[in-house]
Regions:
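Bacterial N-terminal signal peptides that target proteins for export
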Residues: 1-12
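Bacterial N-terminal signal peptides
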Residues: 11-22
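Bacterial signal peptide processing site
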Residues: 25-30
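Immediate post-signal-peptide N-terminus of mature secreted/exported proteins
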Residues: 38-105, 175, 209-245, 358-362
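N-terminal Sec/ER secretory leader and immediately downstream segment
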Residues: 57-175
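Secondary-structure edge/capping motif, primarily at the C-terminal ends of alpha-helices
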Residues: 84-98, 126-133, 154-168, 202, ...
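Extended amphipathic alpha-helical interaction segments
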Residues: 178-304
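A cross-kingdom marker for long, charged
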Residues: 256-362
């Protein structure tokens, strides 16, 4: 499965997508996607290849199974938490808290019902699966603890503002609970970034090995090109929405990443023109939908490439005030750009990942 992305400073980006394990882990601020399908078909080798498994193949398959719970949890909760945080900060100064003088009181969003409990349960199950990975498991534990603590506070704050209780106590509770809410948001953000980073360190090499395995067992056919497009798409969206304190965009990296996606997608399209009849073979696991699924995958990938190219122009033509000496570009200082916005790139990436997860073609 693929993993959508979170949008950083611009909005909410989607999610990691299970395919992320196999090559579509998401970015930072929006965690895009919510339940994605197709995990097994993304990376699982064909039945005839099972007897050729190397010890590394077996280890990778075990790790992929272990990662599912971690990725599902991130996809389910990271984006909603960032959304409710943005909602709250849209009308409250995070440093001072509510003053009671606000013209508009929006409160915040509640988290999805029972999602935190399901998430933490899934993390516990994944933790028990082999192989042991102390860093991953510690990151998962920290994520579970901080999101559970945050959920309790969010429920309390949501009810307070939803029922307009601030009209009765003149914002007394809103002012009192603000420091706790900020501390909980901060703790979660650290845990969220840490789990993202930890998963990133595992899934990227795992994805590269999966791609090499496909080439070893099948050659550069549809499965290889599909996987390659997903991998390069992930690298590009991450280059355009960096995680961490320095979230300025490295133009050289984004430009190179776009070139990789451009070539990978062109290779898939070229192969498809020559071998599209192979998709109609009844031996294809996705038959009789393979050809239609290929077309939908290709359209979604093309839409993503178009938006990514438009954003590339914005970065390339950024005004001097948005550029730093190290070649990075601050998206917040670019100003209006008719060619594209970072949130559009992330949205198209998330759309692409959802399409990919739902439209397997082999």
């Amino acid at each position: 499965m693929g993993m959508p992305v979170r949008l950083g400073t611009m909005a909410m980006v989607g999610a990691l997508a299970l395919g992320a394990m196999t090559g579509t882990l998401g970015c930072k601020k929006l965690l895009k996607g919510r339940g994605n399908k197709g995990t097994s078909t993304t990376t699982t080798p064909t039945a005839t290849a099972k007897n050729t498994n190397t010890p590394q193949d077996d280890a990778d398959e075990a790790m992929q199974e272990k990662l599912d719970g971690y990725i599902i949890c991130l996809n389910t909760l990271s984006s909603p938490v960032h959304a409710t945080r943005s909602r709250y900060f849209s009308w409250v100064n995070p440093k001072t808290g509510p003053t009671g003088q606000e013209r508009v009181v929006l409160g915040l969003f509640d988290l999805p019902n029972d999602k935190v409990a399901k998430c933490t349960s899934g993390l516990a199950k994944s933790k028990a699966l082999p192989p042991k990975d102390a860093k991953l498991e510690a990151a998962g534990d920290d994520f579970a603890r901080t999101v559970t603590d945050l959920d309790v506070i969010i429920d309390e704050v949501f009810t307070y503002y939803e029922n307009k209780n601030f009209k009765d106590d003149k914002f007394a509770k809103g002012k009192a609970i603000h420091p706790r809410l900020i501390a909980a948001f901060s703790a979660f953000s650290k845990a969220d970034n840490n789990l993202h980073s930890t998963l990133d360190g595992i899934t990227k090499p795992l994805s590269q090995r999966a791609l090499a395995r496909i080439e070893r067992e099948e050659g550069k056919k549809f499965r290889f090109h599909r996987k390659h497009v997903l991998l390069t798409a992930r690298e590009l969206v991450e280059a355009g929405d960096p995680v961490g304190e320095d979230d300025n965009v490295d133009f050289a990296l984004y430009n190179a990443s776009f070139g990789e996606l451009d070539r990978a997608l062109t290779d898939l399209q070229s192969y498809g023109l020559l071998h599209k009849n192979d998709l109609d073979a009844q031996t294809n696991p996705a038959w009789p939908l393979a050809k239609s699924n290929f077309d939908q995958f290709n359209r979604a990938a093309e839409d993503y490439r178009k938006k990514a190219r438009e954003y590339l122009r914005c970065l390339r033509d950024a005004p001097p005030k948005a550029r730093s000496a190290n070649g990075k570009v601050d998206p917040d200082k670019i100003g209006p750009c008719n060619d594209g916005r970072p949130r559009d790139v992330v949205q198209k990436y998330n759309d692409f990942i959802h399409t990919s997860n739902d439209h397997q073609f082999p």
